[in-house]
Amino acid sequence: MPQKPEIPTTSVLLIDGNHTDRIGFATHLKNCSPDGTILEAMDGQSGLNLYRSRRMDCVVLALELTDRSGFEVLVDLVPIASKPSIAVVVLTNRIQRGLHEIARQNGAYACFVKQFTTGNDLERAILRAMAFVGQMPKEDRYRPI
């Protein structure tokens, strides 16, 4: 009997220097998608290293990191904001006018204030961000590993 083809699972990288927030969001995502892969990084450099080491479907990025600005990491992840090769959802602790728009102008699909974001909100944003990037031409989406 032929074996079923293996369906690739969703891989999400969660980069957040706040241990409590990172664990909370990661736990929710793991519960919602038990077959998915949720990787965690506590700072920008380790997050970028993980991102470069394997194929990811989405990166959830906190703007407040211990080693650098989340915007620096965002620009590294999405060098051409109009042609994102990876879905990125940004989280922040700041309620600041214009911050969300700046994140979007730099390639993030969405930006949420952590205190007002549920795990369900984040999950929906991840799915929408992946769908959005999936609509891009393939040559704009895929990067060599």
Residue ranges of each PLM-predicted region?
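Conserved phosphotransfer microenvironments
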Residues: 60-77, 96
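CheY-like receiver
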Residues: 131-145
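Active-site residues of response regulator receiver
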Residues: 16, 62-64, 92
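Short amphipathic alpha-helix used as the core "switch/output" element in two-component signaling
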Residues: 49, 71-84
